[in-house]
C-alpha cells in the first residue's frame, strides 16, 4: 500500500526526521490559505498522486502568492496526472500539498531502503546524486550508490550511519543530523512494516540543516492488519479499479496489455503460464492467482474479473489441484460461464487432485469449453483460438 507524500512526511516526522513543512489542500481555497499559513515568500504546490515523475508532468509548481497557489491547485485538482510511472489514463489528483520553499540548498542527496530478498535484510541505499531518477544513477554510475545491509538481530547501528555520512562528504553537525535521520528511518521501516521508502531529495540547506524534501513509502500489504491507523490512510482512488476489486475477493491480480486472460492457482504457475503463452506467440492480458485454497465463489469472481476486460479475446484456465480440488474448480467454471455471457474461447487445463473428475464434469456440461492435456497444449490451443 502506497502513502501520499504528505502522509509519508507526517509519518517520518513522527520518528524524528526533519521534513519540509507543508499543508494538504483539497480545493483551491485551502491551497491559498495554506500559502498564507506557511508565511514564506515562495511555496511549492505538489499534486498528491501515487506516482513519481510529477515534476516533469507539470504536477509540481513554485508559487509566489496565495492567488498563484489557488490557480495552480485549481488547474490540478480534479484532473488526472499522467507521468512516466502511470498508464495512459494517469492518476486522479484529489488534493495538493502546499510545502515551504527550502531552496536554495547546497546539496541534494538520496536515501532509501528496501527489503532485499537476496540478502533477506533491510538494505539502505544512499547517494550524492539526489533529486534525479535514482534508477538512472544505478544504471549509469552504480559506484555512486552506497549500500548498507542491516543485521536484523541488532538493527541499524550508529557507526553504520556515520560511515555513510562520511562517504557522502557530510561534515560537522550535518553528520549527527544524518545519523539521526537514518536511524529514525530504520526505526520507522521496521515498526511500520515498510516494503520500500525513499527520500529524494534529502536536501542540505545553506544553514547546514538536513531536510526531507520528498517522501515515498510503500507499506507491506500483508502486515496492514496490525497497523489500523496506517490502513486508514489508504487512498483507493489511486489504485487500479480491477486490482482493487480483486483484492476485495482475495485475488492477486495485475492488469497487463495482452488479449489472453489467465486464471491460475499459484503465483509461480501463473508466471509460467504467462511465459508459455508468450512463447507460443500470444500476449497475456493479466496475472491472476486465485490462490492455493481457492473457493468456488473466488473462482467465479476471478472469471468475471477477466471477462470485464474488453481486450480479452480468449481465456486460459490452468489449475493444478493440490489443496484445491479440480472438480470444485470445474463446477465453478460452469457456474461462471452460465452467469457471465461468455463469447470468447475458453481453454481449460486441469491437473492433480480430482483432475479426471473435473474434466468429466466439464465434458458433460454441454458448454463449448476447450480441454487441454498439458501446459504446452493449453498455450498452443488458446493462441490458435484467436484465429
Curated annotation (Swiss-Prot):
A GO term for molecular function: succinate-CoA ligase (ADP-forming) activity
GO BP terms, alphabetized: succinyl-CoA metabolic process; tricarboxylic acid cycle
Annotated positions binding ATP: 46, 53-55, 100, 103, 108
Positions of the ATP-grasp domain: 9-245
PANTHER family tied to this protein: SUCCINATE--COA LIGASE [GDP-FORMING] SUBUNIT BETA, MITOCHONDRIAL, SUCCINYL-COA SYNTHETASE BETA CHAIN
Protein name as annotated: Succinate--CoA ligase [ADP-forming] subunit beta
Enzyme kind, highest EC tier: ligase
Cofactor: Mg(2+)
GO terms for cellular component: cytosol; succinate-CoA ligase complex
Binding site for substrate: 265, 322-324
Job description of the protein: Succinyl-CoA synthetase functions in the citric acid cycle (TCA), coupling the hydrolysis of succinyl-CoA to the synthesis of either ATP or GTP and thus represents the only step of substrate-level phosphorylation in the TCA. The beta subunit provides nucleotide specificity of the enzyme and binds the substrate succinate, while the binding sites for coenzyme A and phosphate are found in the alpha subunit.
Binding, Mg(2+): 200, 214
Keywords: ATP-binding, Ligase, Magnesium, Metal-binding, Nucleotide-binding, Tricarboxylic acid cycle
Cofactor: how and how many bound: Binds 1 Mg(2+) ion per subunit.
Family recorded in the similarity comment: Belongs to the succinate/malate CoA ligase beta subunit family.
Pfam families: ATP-grasp_2, Ligase_CoA
Reactions catalysed: succinate + ATP + CoA = succinyl-CoA + ADP + phosphate; GTP + succinate + CoA = succinyl-CoA + GDP + phosphate
Pathway where it operates: Carbohydrate metabolism; tricarboxylic acid cycle; succinate from succinyl-CoA (ligase route): step 1/1
EC number per UniProt: 6.2.1.5
Subunit structure, interactors included: Heterotetramer of two alpha and two beta subunits.
